[in-house]
UniProtKB/Swiss-Prot annotation:
It comes from Haemophilus influenzae (strain ATCC 51907 / DSM 11121 / KW20 / Rd). It catalyses: UDP-N-acetyl-alpha-D-muramoyl-L-alanyl-D-glutamate + meso-2,6-diaminopimelate + ATP = UDP-N-acetyl-alpha-D-muramoyl-L-alanyl-gamma-D-glutamyl-meso-2,6-diaminopimelate + ADP + phosphate + H(+). Catalyzes the addition of meso-diaminopimelic acid to the nucleotide precursor UDP-N-acetylmuramoyl-L-alanyl-D-glutamate (UMAG) in the biosynthesis of bacterial cell-wall peptidoglycan. Its EC number is 6.3.2.13. This is UDP-N-acetylmuramoyl-L-alanyl-D-glutamate--2,6-diaminopimelate ligase.
């Protein structure tokens, strides 16, 4: 519990109030809660103050656009309403105070970049558990103690949700947490008051331009994690063009590369010298500031070599002995919906992956090719009401790397599926190897029944998701379940 006057440094109210939780959604308010009314992109929380009071809110903090109103207190009945200037910007700091700075008592690692955030955050938590920690994770798949993850709405939750979750993890015994930090979360200051032991940058490719408007804005949002927030250790993928540029500006950052010829300069470093890919993963010979060795990876694809090196480098920077990391790496497992392989005797191999950007799709197809002796199939779609510019680019990638392509439905939302297909098809030079099957289950069925034993079918776009968003309705759908049904 936190007292209202202590939270806002207010002069003593006549009757100070003890608050149980901070709540942004008026529908979730309970007696004793502090309702936070901020102006979001779609709705203004101030419109729901009456609803929050009806549900028993003990106090309200309300965003105001007038600096002169900052920390003034009004009353609705007996309930104090504290006006707060630029509340959304400062909400992370307020929640940090409310929940007693939970990130100070956790080893917190933030992971940002277009692709790889989920795999890296999950691997960090998994590896920390193997090293004897109680780990938690927050991100696209969900939030919770490792092995007890609950589905989440957004990659990076609200400023309040993040602080309250970290507090809950701490009280549940966690001492290590990895969190995916999205560009939206950074641009909207949702992680502003967190204390990061380390931050990892994976890569930057086209995504979310419907929100950021330009790649420059997108990169600037990501960069804040390394230049403006409380981040101790910075681990950067040097093979990414933006990452390489940032390394020239961040002399204390650690450089990680898959290029044996990478010139390390003055940075601490990790680089792969030789990589042997095989059906069960890869064997990575590496050299680093912490020593040399061979890392046995259970993950498929070159991009997962990069992901694993970024994770191991971060743990090495924390002081874990190299020999301990190499020994425990053998027990690591893949991540749900991330290059997840499904195999049955005498059937084509199916790989389910979350790839939903041109770069991610290219990397997934290249990785799938390494395990393909026959034809490579690609099933994909593009989300509705989202960046239309990437749709023809996805088609170009699929046409370049796959022999057979099926365009299908992938969360059309309120947009016409035929319009989405038209945008995608504009990227193909030749439609001979392309089929359009809007029903995703039928698309998967057709591919599995048409492909032969040595073929590989990449089902891209949904990964761990078990739903389709059609109109405003969320319908149960799992690529894995459908694939298994038709493979059996």
């Amino acid at each position: 519990m936190k007292k209202l006057t202590a939270l806002f440094n207010l002069p003593e109210l006549k009757n100070d109030i003890e608050l149980h939780n901070m709540v942004l959604d008026s529908r979730k308010v309970k007696a004793g809660d502090l309702f936070v009314a901020i102006k979001g992109h779609q709705v203004d929380g101030n419109q729901f103050i009456d609803s929050a009071l009806h549900s028993g809110a003990s106090a309200v903090v309300s965003e105001t656009e007038l600096s002169s109103e900052h920390l003034t207190v009004a009353f609705i009945g007996n309930v104090p309403v504290v006006k707060y200037y630029q509340l959304a910007h400062h909400l992370s700091s307020l929640a940090d105070v409310f929940y007693d700075s939970p990130s100070n008592n956790l080893t917190l690692v933030g992971v940002t970049g277009t692709n790889g955030k989920t795999t890296i955050s999950q691997l960090l938590a998994q590896w920390a558990e193997l090293l004897g920690h109680r780990a938690a994770v927050m991100g696209t798949i969900g939030n919770g103690l490792f092995g007890q993850i609950v589905e989440a709405k957004n990659t990076t939750g609200s400023a309040v949700e993040i602080q309250s979750s970290l507090s809950a993890f701490k009280h549940a015994g966690a001492d290590f947490t990895s969190i995916e930090v999205s560009s939206h979360g950074l641009a909207q200051h949702r992680v502003e008051a967190l204390h990061f032991k380390a931050a990892i940058f994976t890569n930057l490719t086209r995504d979310h331009l419907d929100y950021h408007q330009s790649m420059e804005n997108y990169a600037a949002a990501k960069k804040r994690l390394f230049t403006e927030l409380d981040t101790q250790i910075k681990v950067i993928n040097a093979d990414d063009e933006i990452g390489y540029q940032w390394l020239t500006e961040l002399p204390d950052a650690i450089a990680v590369s898959m290029n044996a010829d990478f010139k390390v300069g003055s940075h601490q470093w990790m680089k792969a010298i030789n990589i042997h890919y095989h059906f069960k993963g890869a064997d990575i010979t590496f050299e680093s500031s912490w020593g040399n060795g061979v890392l046995h990876s259970p993950l498929i694809g070159a991009f997962n070599v990069s992901n694993l090196l970024l994770v191991m480098t971060t743990l090495l920077s924390f002081g874990y002995p190299l020999e301990n990391l190499l020994a425990t790496a053998k027990s690591l497992k893949g991540v749900c919906g991330r290059m997840e392989m499904i195999q049955y005797p005498n059937k084509p191999t199916v790989i389910v992956d979350y790839a939903h950007t041109p770069d991610a799709l290219e990397k997934a197809l290249i990785a799938a090719r390494e395990h393909c002796q026959g034809e490579l199939w690609c099933i994909f779609g593009c989300g509705g009401d989202r960046d239309r510019g990437k749709r023809p680019l996805m088609a170009q990638v699929a046409e370049q790397f796959a022999e057979k392509i099926i365009v299908t439905k992938d969360n059309p939302r309120t947009e016409s599926q035929s319009q989405i297909e038209t945008d995608i098809v504009a990227g193909f030079k030749n439609m001979e190897k392309v089929g359009i099957i809007p029903d995703r289950a039928q698309a998967i069925q057709f591919a599995i029944e048409s492909a032969v034993e040595n073929d590989v079918i990449l089902i891209a776009g949904k990964g761990h998701e078990h739903y389709q968003i059609i109109g405003s309705e969320v319908v149960h759908f799992s690529d894995q379940e459908i694939a298994l049904d038709f493979l059996k």
